[in-house]
């Protein structure tokens, strides 16, 4: 559960990355493919897996924009993320473990680019991504 302090940090962070979703998302997704090559199997239409690839940029942008969109819904993530959880859990059948792998890659990418690297920020990002991961995994069948 995110504390009020965590929410304040996350809101500030999401506002900062709002204009960088394509670059940060592509880097995080490329990092996922590099560190966990088995995840490439969920993207059969991709011809490349680097951060410069058009499809990687597009999907990374979608993911980071979805995170930014949670900014006004931090008190109701289960409801806000329900459709994404349903799509990934029931339609795409993404193994829930992959959400944790990807959230780790997102955290590393954010840490590499953000100037604010306090323990409080790291903790808030970790808790936020853990909550998003939990919600996205909630409808897996």
From Swiss-Prot:
<dbReference type="GO" id="GO:0020037">
    <property type="term" value="F:heme binding"/>
</dbReference>
<dbReference type="GO" id="GO:0042744">
    <property type="term" value="P:hydrogen peroxide catabolic process"/>
</dbReference>
<dbReference type="GO" id="GO:0019825">
    <property type="term" value="F:oxygen binding"/>
</dbReference>
<feature type="binding site">
    <location>
        <position position="59"/>
    </location>
    <ligand>
        <name>O2</name>
    </ligand>
</feature>
<dbReference type="InterPro" id="IPR002338">
    <property type="entry name" value="Hemoglobin_a-typ"/>
</dbReference>
<dbReference type="GO" id="GO:0046872">
    <property type="term" value="F:metal ion binding"/>
</dbReference>
<keyword id="KW-0561">Oxygen transport</keyword>
<dbReference type="GO" id="GO:0031720">
    <property type="term" value="F:haptoglobin binding"/>
</dbReference>
<protein>
    <recommendedName>
        <fullName>Hemoglobin subunit alpha-2</fullName>
    </recommendedName>
</protein>
<dbReference type="InterPro" id="IPR012292">
    <property type="entry name" value="Globin/Proto"/>
</dbReference>
<dbReference type="GO" id="GO:0005344">
    <property type="term" value="F:oxygen carrier activity"/>
</dbReference>
<dbReference type="Pfam" id="PF00042">
    <property type="entry name" value="Globin"/>
</dbReference>
<dbReference type="GO" id="GO:0043177">
    <property type="term" value="F:organic acid binding"/>
</dbReference>
<keyword id="KW-0408">Iron</keyword>
<dbReference type="InterPro" id="IPR000971">
    <property type="entry name" value="Globin"/>
</dbReference>
<dbReference type="GO" id="GO:0005833">
    <property type="term" value="C:hemoglobin complex"/>
</dbReference>
<comment type="similarity">
    <text>Belongs to the globin family.</text>
</comment>
<dbReference type="GO" id="GO:0004601">
    <property type="term" value="F:peroxidase activity"/>
</dbReference>
<keyword id="KW-0349">Heme</keyword>
<keyword id="KW-0479">Metal-binding</keyword>
<feature type="domain" description="Globin">
    <location>
        <begin position="1"/>
        <end position="141"/>
    </location>
</feature>
<dbReference type="InterPro" id="IPR009050">
    <property type="entry name" value="Globin-like_sf"/>
</dbReference>
<feature type="binding site" description="proximal binding residue">
    <location>
        <position position="88"/>
    </location>
    <ligand>
        <name>heme b</name>
    </ligand>
</feature>
<keyword id="KW-0813">Transport</keyword>
<comment type="function">
    <text>Involved in oxygen transport from the lung to the various peripheral tissues.</text>
</comment>
<dbReference type="InterPro" id="IPR050056">
    <property type="entry name" value="Hemoglobin_oxygen_transport"/>
</dbReference>
<dbReference type="GO" id="GO:0031838">
    <property type="term" value="C:haptoglobin-hemoglobin complex"/>
</dbReference>
<comment type="subunit">
    <text>Heterotetramer of two alpha chains and two beta chains.</text>
</comment>
<dbReference type="GO" id="GO:0072562">
    <property type="term" value="C:blood microparticle"/>
</dbReference>
């Amino acid at each position: 559960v995110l504390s009020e302090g965590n929410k304040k940090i996350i809101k500030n962070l999401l506002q900062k990355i709002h204009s960088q979703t394509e670059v940060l998302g592509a880097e995080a997704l490329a990092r996922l493919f590099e560190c966990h090559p088995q995840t490439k199997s969920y993207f059969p239409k991709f011809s490349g897996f680097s951060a410069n690839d058009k499809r990687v940029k597009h999907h990374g942008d979608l993911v980071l924009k979805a995170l930014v969109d949670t900014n006004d819904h931090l008190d109701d993530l289960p409801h806000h993320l329900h459709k994404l959880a349903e799509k990934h859990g029931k339609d795409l059948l993404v193994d829930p473990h992959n959400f944790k792998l990807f959230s780790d890659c997102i955290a590393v990418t954010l840490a590499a680019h953000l100037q604010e690297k306090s323990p409080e920020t790291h903790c808030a990002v970790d808790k936020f991504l853990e909550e998003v991961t939990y919600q996205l995994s909630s409808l897996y069948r």
